[in-house]
Amino acid sequence: MRTQSATTTITRAVTVAAGVFAPGHLGELTQYLPFELVDDILEQTRTVQRRLRDLPSRVGVYFLLALGMYPRLGYARVWAKLTAGLEGLPVACPSEKALRDLRRRLGPAPLKALFEVVAGPLAQPHTRGVRFGGLRTVAFDGCNSLKVPDTGRNRWWLGRIRYRMGFAGYPTLRLMALAETGTRGLLGAALGSAADRDEATVARRLLPLLHPGMLVLLDRAFDANAFLGEVAATGALLLARAKSTRHPYVLGHLPDGSYLSHLDGLKVRIIEATLTMTGADGSRVRDSYRLITTLMDHRRFPAPAVVRLYHERWEIEIGHRWYRSSCAAFSWLRSFVVAGFRFLRCPAGAAVEARRACPAFA
């Protein structure tokens, strides 16, 4: 027999939960969101099923996580993925209505608690590229690509984005995230209306996650005296790009070309720079940047190094690529009611964090 015609039989053992709990898993990712963790979350949020039937609460949590990982698929097809490797086991075959009822029965509380446990810094003390001068670099950014069905209730809650030529076709959610720039690991997330032009409104809900030892990178959408003062009040240091309309007072010049100023009593250092970007075709684009920072020591944090650091803020933009690319593939989110949108942050975030923790499946 020719060698290229030879065959090999591969068998493997799969360990799953017993009985009606068997569909509750995420395959290889289950080790990062184990049964014990999910059961503890259900106990804490008092969402354990009262009677053990075909769809227990633990199975519901993993089903909702799978919905976040397969946003293009309907309920039945996502359930089929959870049960595809369970041939020979007496697993339930629920209707889509039963799965919708399971989702409503759980509510957002267990998913929110699970997200808060899983989200957090991923970098180890020895990880390179996650610190600047001993400070952990993090960044805020908003994603406005999450459209919801155009119903009266959704328009009342979210409004619609207004453009020069009219209103957007669908009400839109804003997903505000706080991420570690070196690993793109989520530290927290919050949902709000994209019709509110002020991104800082949603970002304020994430300020309790900041603490001394952090350096927050902000784009010019967050350049407001009140918000910058609130960030500084957490003990974290900040580096923000100023709007083109801001012209700070000069209180004193520093040897590296930066100067001192203040914003409503907040002492800051201003760094001005002109950046030239060269494209692959040789074309050049120039832009002027005015950076606001509370890194006051120009010897420890020289202006050229701070300007180079600001580029790291784009890491959170890359982290948002998954949300933008997946949401661009379909018209709107699957839920038609406000309560359903509150599930968005939790299953998607926890699933993404689990996938990032296991590089082979990222």
Which residue ranges define each predicted feature?
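Single, function-defining residue in the core of a domain
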Residues: 1-77, 103-106, 113-114, 133-135, ...
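DNA-recognition alpha helix
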Residues: 74-90
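Major-groove recognition helix of helix-turn-helix-like DNA-binding domains
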Residues: 90-108
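Generic beta-strand or strand-like secondary-structure segments
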Residues: 81, 98-101, 117
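Solvent-exposed amphipathic alpha-helical surface segments
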Residues: 85, 89, 121, 125, ...
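Short Lys/Arg-enriched helix C-cap and helix-to-coil transition segments
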Residues: 109-122
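Short acidic (Asp/Glu) patches
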Residues: 120-124, 153-163
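Long amphipathic N-terminal alpha/beta scaffold segment
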Residues: 123-131, 147
